[in-house]
Amino acid sequence: MAANDTIGDMLTRIRNANLARHQTTQVMSTRMTRSVASVLKDEGFITSFEESGEGVERRLVITLKYRGKNRQPIINTLQRISKPGLRVYSNRRDLPRVLGGIGIAIISTSSGIMTDRDARQTGVGGEVLCYVW
């Protein structure tokens, strides 16, 4: 597992599991990955997530969501925006709208991890972690 970019690793694992139509995937459990998974669950992109293991071996088991009998993934695209080599910040007036409001941007703010919609309502800006649609 990539120890330096846990969010990038998490998004890649979810993307790969979606392409392979897996029911679950495991990612390293950190406070940040738990917060991002919580936002994805609240927005309906994943079914659930739970923590397993102890200490260094803690993992988040994420249950993915599909629609129809052909099992089309709910998540079409997961795009990492702010990376360790190039951080992307946005103030409250310039928060991005993803696909005109169809998708979400996950923002790391001083009030915690939230969607672009919640950040706009709260009136805070922050680091743009990723886009999901």
Curated annotation (Swiss-Prot):
The gene is rpsH. It comes from the Bacteria. Coiled coil: none annotated. It comes from Acaryochloris marina (strain MBIC 11017). The keyword Transcription regulation does not apply. GO terms for cellular component: ribonucleoprotein complex; ribosome. Disulfide bonds: none annotated. GO terms for biological process: translation. Belongs to the universal ribosomal protein uS8 family. The keyword RNA-binding applies. Keywords: Ribonucleoprotein, Ribosomal protein, RNA-binding, rRNA-binding. Pfam families: Ribosomal_S8 (PF00410). Part of the 30S ribosomal subunit. Contacts proteins S5 and S12. One of the primary rRNA binding proteins, it binds directly to 16S rRNA central domain where it helps coordinate assembly of the platform of the 30S subunit. This is Small ribosomal subunit protein uS8. One of its GO terms (molecular function) is rRNA binding.
